Amino acid sequence: MNNVLKNAGLFLRLFWLRFQQNKLSQAAGYLTYSTMLALVPLVMVVFSVFSAFPVFNEVTDELKGFIFNNFAPQASDMVGQYIDEFVSNSKQMSAVGVISLVVVALMLINSIDRTLNSIWHDTTIRPLVFSFAIYWLILTLGPLLIGASIGVSSYIAAMLNENISLPFGLKILSFVPFFLTWLIFTLIYTVVPNKKVKIMHSAIGALVAAVFFTLGKQAFLWYVTTFPSYQLIYGAMATLPIMLLWIQLSWVVILIGAQLASVLADYTLCTQGKIRVEELVAADTHEPALQQKMEKTEQTLKTEITQQKQRLEKQG
């Protein structure tokens, strides 16, 4: 029992130190600002990609519903009108205008990339061509994956609504949207950081983020429907603070999930006695000696694990 409490205290201490170091609330604010600037370009790019694939024509309305439910509670009519105007105006833009919007969208992806890598305290810089290729794949393949997931979720929801007497095994399918959110967060925490992240750590951080994201969405929707005082204060401009607040909360949840995945790796080193919390935190000042010690510690752990596996195989 004492060991459990001691380990829990160590983990919470390390998490709190990381939270203060990473300044997650400020990082979330920065990403919120970047998201608002890149929102129109992203919407334009996403729907342009969908228009190039007729199979996703029926998914367009579902995607709008997804945006309303996740990023614009109680503002669906106004946001829907804006989206239609954005898509209509994008068809009349020149090549230079389209390129500039794509660049802004890529800048948002770059901001997310740098913010997540800062949580893992990785200063490695990818080659420019490699980074551009990754960002472009995210920008083009991302909408297709989102469209596919929304299509599957909509199909399952329709099936469940039509037949309420489905067996329990099939009713579990109603959790597919949650599992898709969990999968997306896991992929983000695994692929985006330059450091190698264990899939178990990514999955745990993503699970916590997905749970808080889902609960937060329901709580936020309940708040804006139960206490509509913001409409009296802001009037026709009420959509803007609603979206700003929800995007801010969403980024806080996503970054906390990323930090949890990062802290799990640090926590493992500390519990094995390979490095102290003070040394681990001090290493993030990028002092070469401490950085080298951390790298050496990780390498030593890998060697010990390999040797232990070899001994077990011989004994077997």
Swiss-Prot record:
Indicate where this protein resides in the cell. Answer: Cell inner membrane
Organism ancestry? Bacteria, Pseudomonadati, Pseudomonadota, Gammaproteobacteria, Pasteurellales
**Keyword tags:** Cell inner membrane, Cell membrane, Membrane, Transmembrane, Transmembrane helix
Main localization, broad class:
membrane
Q: How does it sit in the membrane?
A: Multi-pass membrane protein
Q: Indicate yes or no for the key word Membrane.
A: yes
Gene Ontology, cellular component aspect = plasma membrane
The domain of life is Bacteria
Q: Which family does it belong to?
A: Belongs to the UPF0761 family.
Q: Which residues cross the membrane?
A: 36-56, 92-112, 128-148, 172-192, 204-224, 236-256
The record's annotation in Pfam families points to: Virul_fac_BrkB
Identify this protein by name.
UPF0761 membrane protein PM1616
Q: Would I find Transmembrane among this entry's keywords?
A: yes
